Protein backbone atom coordinates (compact mmCIF):
# COMPACT_ATOMS: atom_id res chain seq x y z
CA UNK A 1 0.00 0.00 0.00
CA UNK A 2 1.32 3.42 -0.94
CA UNK A 3 1.33 6.31 1.53
CA UNK A 4 0.43 9.34 -0.59
CA UNK A 5 -0.66 12.90 0.15
CA UNK A 6 -2.77 15.07 -2.12
CA UNK A 7 -2.12 18.80 -1.74
CA UNK A 8 -4.42 21.53 -3.09
CA UNK A 9 -4.97 25.18 -2.23
CA UNK A 10 -7.61 23.97 0.25
CA UNK A 11 -5.15 21.85 2.24
CA UNK A 12 -3.60 18.39 2.30
CA UNK A 13 -5.46 15.06 2.28
CA UNK A 14 -4.35 11.44 2.43
CA UNK A 15 -4.90 9.23 -0.62
CA UNK A 16 -5.74 5.75 0.60
CA UNK A 17 -6.21 2.37 -1.05
CA UNK A 18 -3.56 2.72 -3.77
CA UNK A 19 -0.61 0.45 -4.57
CA UNK A 20 2.18 0.68 -7.12
CA UNK A 21 0.00 -1.52 -9.38
CA UNK A 22 -2.93 0.93 -9.26
CA UNK A 23 -3.72 2.70 -12.54
CA UNK A 24 -3.77 6.39 -13.37
CA UNK A 25 -7.55 6.09 -13.66
CA UNK A 26 -7.77 4.77 -10.08
CA UNK A 27 -5.49 7.56 -8.89
CA UNK A 28 -7.70 10.18 -10.55
CA UNK A 29 -10.78 8.64 -8.96
CA UNK A 30 -9.18 8.85 -5.51
CA UNK A 31 -8.12 12.45 -6.14
CA UNK A 32 -11.62 13.36 -7.32
CA UNK A 33 -13.02 11.81 -4.15
CA UNK A 34 -11.01 14.06 -1.82
CA UNK A 35 -10.79 17.23 -3.93
CA UNK A 36 -13.98 17.31 -6.00
CA UNK A 37 -11.89 17.89 -9.15
CA UNK A 38 -12.95 15.45 -11.86
CA UNK A 39 -10.29 13.40 -13.65
CA UNK A 40 -10.31 15.24 -17.00
CA UNK A 41 -9.73 18.57 -15.22
CA UNK A 42 -6.89 17.41 -12.98
CA UNK A 43 -3.35 18.67 -13.29
CA UNK A 44 -1.09 16.56 -11.06
CA UNK A 45 2.50 17.44 -10.18
CA UNK A 46 5.08 15.53 -8.15
CA UNK A 47 8.71 15.83 -7.12
CA UNK A 48 10.99 18.77 -6.39
CA UNK A 49 10.79 20.99 -8.26
CA UNK A 50 7.22 19.84 -9.07
CA UNK A 51 6.80 18.34 -12.55
CA UNK A 52 3.46 17.62 -14.24
CA UNK A 53 2.51 13.99 -14.76
CA UNK A 54 1.32 12.72 -18.12
CA UNK A 55 -2.17 11.40 -17.31
CA UNK A 56 -3.12 10.56 -20.90
CA UNK A 57 -2.71 6.78 -20.45
CA UNK A 58 -5.32 5.92 -17.84
CA UNK A 59 -4.17 2.29 -17.65
CA UNK A 60 -0.54 3.12 -16.84
CA UNK A 61 0.44 2.04 -13.32
CA UNK A 62 1.73 4.32 -10.60
CA UNK A 63 4.96 2.33 -10.63
CA UNK A 64 5.39 3.20 -14.31
CA UNK A 65 4.86 6.86 -13.41
CA UNK A 66 7.59 6.64 -10.73
CA UNK A 67 5.10 7.52 -7.99
CA UNK A 68 6.36 6.08 -4.72
CA UNK A 69 5.25 5.86 -1.11
CA UNK A 70 5.75 9.14 0.75
CA UNK A 71 5.16 11.34 -2.30
CA UNK A 72 3.00 14.46 -2.08
CA UNK A 73 0.94 15.05 -5.23
CA UNK A 74 0.15 18.69 -5.96
CA UNK A 75 -3.25 18.88 -7.64
CA UNK A 76 -4.76 21.83 -9.49
CA UNK A 77 -7.88 22.28 -11.58
CA UNK A 78 -6.81 22.86 -15.18
CA UNK A 79 -9.19 25.68 -16.07
CA UNK A 80 -7.92 25.81 -19.64
CA UNK A 81 -9.83 22.60 -20.29
CA UNK A 82 -13.05 24.32 -19.25
CA UNK A 83 -12.80 26.83 -22.08
CA UNK A 84 -14.30 25.69 -25.36
CA UNK A 85 -12.61 28.49 -27.25
CA UNK A 86 -10.33 31.41 -26.63
CA UNK A 87 -11.53 34.77 -28.00
CA UNK A 88 -9.11 36.66 -30.25
CA UNK A 89 -6.97 39.28 -28.60
CA UNK A 90 -7.62 42.80 -29.87
CA UNK A 91 -5.14 45.65 -29.94
CA UNK A 92 -7.17 47.30 -27.20
CA UNK A 93 -6.76 44.22 -25.05
CA UNK A 94 -3.01 44.30 -25.61
CA UNK A 95 -2.81 47.96 -24.70
CA UNK A 96 -4.69 47.42 -21.44
CA UNK A 97 -2.82 44.25 -20.52
CA UNK A 98 -1.04 44.30 -17.16
CA UNK A 99 1.77 41.94 -16.23
CA UNK A 100 0.59 39.28 -13.79
CA UNK A 101 1.58 39.62 -10.17
CA UNK A 102 4.74 37.77 -9.22
CA UNK A 103 4.97 34.94 -6.68
CA UNK A 104 5.93 36.36 -3.30
CA UNK A 105 7.01 35.18 0.14
CA UNK A 106 4.31 35.62 2.80
CA UNK A 107 3.84 34.74 6.45
CA UNK A 108 1.49 31.90 7.42
CA UNK A 109 0.39 32.76 10.97
CA UNK A 110 0.25 29.92 13.50
CA UNK A 111 -1.09 30.12 17.08
CA UNK A 112 1.04 32.04 19.58
CA UNK A 113 1.44 29.17 22.00
CA UNK A 114 4.53 27.57 23.51
CA UNK A 115 4.92 25.26 20.50
CA UNK A 116 4.89 27.75 17.61
CA UNK A 117 8.42 26.73 16.57
CA UNK A 118 7.49 23.07 16.24
CA UNK A 119 4.20 23.82 14.47
CA UNK A 120 6.02 26.12 12.04
CA UNK A 121 8.80 23.68 11.20
CA UNK A 122 6.37 20.82 10.72
CA UNK A 123 4.25 23.02 8.43
CA UNK A 124 7.11 23.89 6.10
CA UNK A 125 8.91 20.54 5.93
CA UNK A 126 5.64 18.70 5.30
CA UNK A 127 4.75 20.95 2.38
CA UNK A 128 2.07 23.06 4.06
CA UNK A 129 0.46 20.60 6.48
CA UNK A 130 -0.87 22.45 9.53
CA UNK A 131 -1.11 20.10 12.50
CA UNK A 132 -0.84 21.61 16.02
CA UNK A 133 -0.82 18.08 17.45
CA UNK A 134 2.63 17.52 15.91
CA UNK A 135 4.36 19.44 18.72
CA UNK A 136 4.28 16.60 21.24
CA UNK A 137 5.76 14.17 18.71
CA UNK A 138 8.50 16.62 17.71
CA UNK A 139 9.40 17.34 21.33
CA UNK A 140 9.73 13.60 21.97
CA UNK A 141 11.82 13.20 18.82
CA UNK A 142 14.24 15.91 19.96
CA UNK A 143 14.50 14.37 23.44
CA UNK A 144 15.31 10.96 21.93
CA UNK A 145 18.01 12.42 19.67
CA UNK A 146 19.60 14.35 22.55
CA UNK A 147 19.48 11.36 24.91
CA UNK A 148 21.15 9.14 22.30
CA UNK A 149 24.27 11.34 22.04
CA UNK A 150 25.26 12.62 25.47
CA UNK A 151 28.77 13.60 24.36
CA UNK A 152 27.50 15.98 21.66
CA UNK A 153 24.61 17.25 23.79
CA UNK A 154 26.42 17.93 27.05
CA UNK A 155 25.87 20.48 29.83
CA UNK A 156 27.91 23.14 28.03
CA UNK A 157 25.73 22.89 24.92
CA UNK A 158 22.34 22.48 26.58
CA UNK A 159 22.81 24.74 29.61
CA UNK A 160 21.61 21.87 31.80
CA UNK A 161 22.29 18.18 32.12
CA UNK A 162 21.28 15.89 29.27
CA UNK A 163 18.65 14.22 31.42
CA UNK A 164 17.24 17.53 32.67
CA UNK A 165 17.03 18.87 29.12
CA UNK A 166 15.17 15.80 27.86
CA UNK A 167 12.57 16.18 30.61
CA UNK A 168 12.37 19.93 30.01
CA UNK A 169 11.84 19.84 26.23
CA UNK A 170 9.00 17.32 26.57
CA UNK A 171 6.99 19.80 28.64
CA UNK A 172 4.28 21.68 26.73
CA UNK A 173 5.10 24.98 28.48
CA UNK A 174 8.69 25.25 27.21
CA UNK A 175 9.84 27.14 24.13
CA UNK A 176 12.07 25.90 21.34
CA UNK A 177 15.03 27.85 20.01
CA UNK A 178 18.36 27.51 18.23
CA UNK A 179 19.24 24.10 19.70
CA UNK A 180 15.95 22.60 18.57
CA UNK A 181 16.15 24.19 15.10
CA UNK A 182 19.65 22.75 14.66
CA UNK A 183 18.51 19.26 15.67
CA UNK A 184 15.50 19.34 13.36
CA UNK A 185 17.61 20.64 10.47
CA UNK A 186 19.78 17.52 10.75
CA UNK A 187 16.79 15.22 11.19
CA UNK A 188 14.91 16.55 8.14
CA UNK A 189 18.11 16.94 6.09
CA UNK A 190 17.26 20.48 5.05
CA UNK A 191 18.54 23.99 5.66
CA UNK A 192 16.28 25.92 8.05
CA UNK A 193 16.54 29.70 7.69
CA UNK A 194 15.18 31.86 10.51
CA UNK A 195 14.60 35.51 9.58
CA UNK A 196 14.74 37.87 12.59
CA UNK A 197 12.42 40.87 12.25
CA UNK A 198 14.27 42.96 14.84
CA UNK A 199 17.73 42.72 13.28
CA UNK A 200 16.68 41.72 9.72
CA UNK A 201 19.23 38.92 9.98
CA UNK A 202 18.95 35.37 8.65
CA UNK A 203 20.27 32.55 10.83
CA UNK A 204 20.89 29.57 8.55
CA UNK A 205 20.92 26.16 10.21
CA UNK A 206 22.50 23.40 8.13
CA UNK A 207 24.01 25.90 5.69
CA UNK A 208 27.31 24.00 5.39
CA UNK A 209 25.80 20.52 5.31
CA UNK A 210 25.26 20.30 1.56
CA UNK A 211 21.48 20.02 1.79
CA UNK A 212 19.52 20.69 -1.41
CA UNK A 213 16.29 21.77 0.29
CA UNK A 214 15.56 24.90 2.31
CA UNK A 215 12.63 26.05 4.47
CA UNK A 216 11.97 29.50 5.94
CA UNK A 217 10.68 30.78 9.28
CA UNK A 218 10.20 34.33 10.56
CA UNK A 219 10.89 35.24 14.21
CA UNK A 220 9.82 38.39 16.07
CA UNK A 221 11.66 37.85 19.35
CA UNK A 222 9.13 35.53 20.98
CA UNK A 223 7.11 33.95 18.17
CA UNK A 224 7.85 31.87 15.07
CA UNK A 225 5.72 31.68 11.92
CA UNK A 226 6.37 29.68 8.74
CA UNK A 227 7.01 31.45 5.44
CA UNK A 228 5.67 30.25 2.11
CA UNK A 229 5.66 31.35 -1.52
CA UNK A 230 2.20 32.49 -2.60
CA UNK A 231 1.34 32.34 -6.31
CA UNK A 232 -0.92 34.74 -8.25
CA UNK A 233 -2.98 31.77 -9.47
CA UNK A 234 -5.39 31.02 -6.59
CA UNK A 235 -5.51 27.38 -7.68
CA UNK A 236 -1.77 26.97 -7.17
CA UNK A 237 -0.99 25.77 -3.62
CA UNK A 238 1.68 27.67 -1.68
CA UNK A 239 5.26 26.41 -1.77
CA UNK A 240 7.05 25.82 1.54
CA UNK A 241 10.13 23.83 0.46
CA UNK A 242 12.70 25.64 -1.69
CA UNK A 243 15.94 24.77 -3.40
CA UNK A 244 19.05 26.02 -1.60
CA UNK A 245 19.91 27.77 -4.87
CA UNK A 246 16.69 29.84 -4.71
CA UNK A 247 18.20 33.12 -3.52
CA UNK A 248 15.08 35.06 -4.53
CA UNK A 249 13.20 33.41 -1.66
CA UNK A 250 15.80 34.69 0.80
CA UNK A 251 15.69 38.20 -0.67
CA UNK A 252 11.90 38.35 -0.36
CA UNK A 253 12.05 36.94 3.18
CA UNK A 254 14.49 39.72 4.14
CA UNK A 255 12.18 42.31 2.58
CA UNK A 256 9.27 40.92 4.59
CA UNK A 257 11.33 41.09 7.80
CA UNK A 258 12.48 44.64 7.07
CA UNK A 259 8.90 45.73 6.51
CA UNK A 260 7.93 44.19 9.87
CA UNK A 261 10.87 45.96 11.54
CA UNK A 262 9.82 49.33 10.15
CA UNK A 263 6.34 48.73 11.55
CA UNK A 264 7.97 47.64 14.84
CA UNK A 265 6.35 44.22 14.61
CA UNK A 266 8.89 42.62 16.91
CA UNK A 267 9.48 42.13 20.63
CA UNK A 268 12.81 43.17 22.12
CA UNK A 269 13.21 40.54 24.83
CA UNK A 270 16.16 42.46 26.29
CA UNK A 271 13.88 45.42 27.05
CA UNK A 272 10.94 43.51 28.54
CA UNK A 273 9.60 45.17 31.72
CA UNK A 274 9.09 42.23 34.08
CA UNK A 275 8.14 41.63 37.69
CA UNK A 276 9.04 38.65 39.84
CA UNK A 277 5.70 37.28 41.03
CA UNK A 278 7.35 35.75 44.11
CA UNK A 279 9.05 38.85 45.59
CA UNK A 280 7.60 41.61 43.33
CA UNK A 281 11.04 42.85 42.26
CA UNK A 282 11.05 44.83 39.01
CA UNK A 283 13.37 43.56 36.25
CA UNK A 284 14.27 44.50 32.68
CA UNK A 285 14.86 41.85 30.03
CA UNK A 286 15.30 38.12 29.96
CA UNK A 287 18.94 38.28 31.11
CA UNK A 288 17.97 40.03 34.33
CA UNK A 289 15.18 37.53 34.88
CA UNK A 290 17.59 34.64 34.33
CA UNK A 291 20.11 36.07 36.82
CA UNK A 292 17.38 36.69 39.38
CA UNK A 293 16.18 33.11 39.02
CA UNK A 294 19.70 31.77 39.62
CA UNK A 295 20.17 33.94 42.72
CA UNK A 296 16.77 33.38 44.33
CA UNK A 297 15.25 30.27 42.80
CA UNK A 298 12.23 32.35 41.77
CA UNK A 299 10.99 31.32 38.32
CA UNK A 300 7.56 32.94 37.99
CA UNK A 301 7.72 36.26 36.12
CA UNK A 302 5.02 38.49 34.69
CA UNK A 303 5.24 41.22 32.05
CA UNK A 304 4.47 44.70 33.36
UniProtKB/Swiss-Prot annotation:
Active site: 113, 116 (nucleophile), 223, 298
Species name: Xenopus laevis
UniProt gene name: yod1
Region (UBX-like): 5-83
Binding site for substrate: 222
A biological-process GO annotation: protein K48-linked deubiquitination
Single GO MF descriptor: cysteine-type deubiquitinase activity
GO cellular component: cytoplasm; cytosol; nucleus
Main location: cytoplasm
Chain residue ranges for the region called His-loop: 219-223
Residue span of region Variable-loop: 169-179
Ranges where the record places region Cys-loop: 110-116
PROSITE patterns referenced in this protein's UniProt entry, alphabetically: OTU, ZINC_FINGER_C2H2_1
Cellular localisation: Cytoplasm
Domain of life: Eukaryota
Chemical reaction(s) catalysed: Thiol-dependent hydrolysis of ester, thioester, amide, peptide and isopeptide bonds formed by the C-terminal Gly of ubiquitin (a 76-residue protein attached to proteins as an intracellular targeting signal)
Keywords assigned by UniProt, alphabetized: Cytoplasm, Hydrolase, Metal-binding, Protease, Thiol protease, Ubl conjugation pathway, Unfolded protein response, Zinc, Zinc-finger
Taxonomy of the source species: Eukaryota, Metazoa, Chordata, Craniata, Vertebrata
EC number(s) stated in the UniProt entry for this protein: 3.4.19.12
Name listed for the protein in its UniProt record: Ubiquitin thioesterase OTU1
